[in-house]
Amino acid sequence: MLQAIKFSKGNLEILDQLQLPFVEEYIPIRTTEDGWHAIKDMKVRGAPAIAIVAMLALAAELTSAVDSDKLSQSPEEVCQYITEKLAYLVTSRPTAVNLADAARKLEAVVTDCTKAPGSTGHEVATAFIKAAEDMMGKDLEDNKRIGHNGAEWIAIHAAKGNSEVAVLTHCNTGSLATSGYGTALGVVRSLAEKNTLRHAYCTETRPYNQGSRLTAFELVHDKIPATLITDSMAAALLADTKVGVNAIVVGADRVAANGDTANKIGTYALAVLAKYHGVKFLVAAPRTTIDMATASGKDIVIEQRAASEVTSIKGPRAGSEATDQIAIETVKIAAPGINVWNPAFDITPASLIDGIITEVGVVEKGADEKYHLGGLFDGSTF
């Protein structure tokens, strides 16, 4: 399984996803500024991975300060420093709720440590570092549970009596988008491990091509039977009875309290197609992605990306992969002067979602045809 995030003894390295799948290069992240730019520039992406890298970037910076004895001994000063850095990191990707959620949780950790009698600046920093490391470990555990829960649900509700299923996924939600294993792609991995996956299909996911560059890369790496399609081929794929897609499984950057889901642009279109073709549509996400403070999708801020992502494309020159020197080039593909609208995400209404796969189980709509996600947090749902 791919490892996109490496953290050991205060040293953080991430796999530069802008160069994948042609070049595998790990880049060091030593400061919060390094982490902020890596997230903003999409060298790392995927809601869980963004949160983990942001927290570990600050952990790496704090480790360096502790080791060089440059950290204030005042717990209040260290707490304030951490709080300001967390606020800065959250601005790198505002749509992904995991980042803000992680910042709130770790801010609470350092605040509690600061209030403890006799605490020191060193202890406050150490508490943050440990909490960030623990967060990474828990994410991996949660992902494997999500994969298992989703695979079990699909076998019961979407297989239609078949021993194997075909699944379509969108964007990248695997090891490259999380601490490891993945959310929606984790469901695909779990199906493959259980020998119940007939075939996986992935969209290229324009305009940033996370599907063709990253998901396809992971599927090939893990030797999972898979086929790449363009985004515009999805309807034809679902209509093809010979293919027989059983379910569409996607990730999420934010799930509102009513189940409305913000995810990579194109997700909404897939949900509409799934409803028309009678294909199950599932969202796979840890509970940290569910924002009970956001009532519906109308309240979610959608990030607008640069026009250049649509009007140009990056990759090596054809044939250069046969050499040791691979240079990533940018090629223009649109008419000069054309206006561009480039939202990074869209909102899929809860009414189009058949189930939300979490680490504690799969939530379905109630008798009133609405999601009641509060039970995921008070233990009443499962």
Curated annotation (Swiss-Prot):
<keyword id="KW-0539">Nucleus</keyword>
<dbReference type="InterPro" id="IPR042529">
    <property type="entry name" value="IF_2B-like_C"/>
</dbReference>
<dbReference type="InterPro" id="IPR005251">
    <property type="entry name" value="IF-M1Pi"/>
</dbReference>
<feature type="site" description="Transition state stabilizer">
    <location>
        <position position="171"/>
    </location>
</feature>
<dbReference type="GO" id="GO:0005634">
    <property type="term" value="C:nucleus"/>
</dbReference>
<keyword id="KW-0028">Amino-acid biosynthesis</keyword>
<dbReference type="Pfam" id="PF01008">
    <property type="entry name" value="IF-2B"/>
</dbReference>
<comment type="pathway">
    <text>Amino-acid biosynthesis; L-methionine biosynthesis via salvage pathway; L-methionine from S-methyl-5-thio-alpha-D-ribose 1-phosphate: step 1/6.</text>
</comment>
<dbReference type="InterPro" id="IPR037171">
    <property type="entry name" value="NagB/RpiA_transferase-like"/>
</dbReference>
<dbReference type="GO" id="GO:0046523">
    <property type="term" value="F:S-methyl-5-thioribose-1-phosphate isomerase activity"/>
</dbReference>
<dbReference type="InterPro" id="IPR027363">
    <property type="entry name" value="M1Pi_N"/>
</dbReference>
<dbReference type="InterPro" id="IPR000649">
    <property type="entry name" value="IF-2B-related"/>
</dbReference>
<dbReference type="InterPro" id="IPR011559">
    <property type="entry name" value="Initiation_fac_2B_a/b/d"/>
</dbReference>
<dbReference type="GO" id="GO:0005737">
    <property type="term" value="C:cytoplasm"/>
</dbReference>
<keyword id="KW-0963">Cytoplasm</keyword>
<comment type="similarity">
    <text>Belongs to the eIF-2B alpha/beta/delta subunits family. MtnA subfamily.</text>
</comment>
<feature type="active site" description="Proton donor">
    <location>
        <position position="253"/>
    </location>
</feature>
<dbReference type="GO" id="GO:0019509">
    <property type="term" value="P:L-methionine salvage from methylthioadenosine"/>
</dbReference>
<protein>
    <recommendedName>
        <fullName>Methylthioribose-1-phosphate isomerase</fullName>
        <ecNumber>5.3.1.23</ecNumber>
    </recommendedName>
</protein>
<keyword id="KW-0413">Isomerase</keyword>
<comment type="function">
    <text>Catalyzes the interconversion of methylthioribose-1-phosphate (MTR-1-P) into methylthioribulose-1-phosphate (MTRu-1-P).</text>
</comment>
<keyword id="KW-0486">Methionine biosynthesis</keyword>
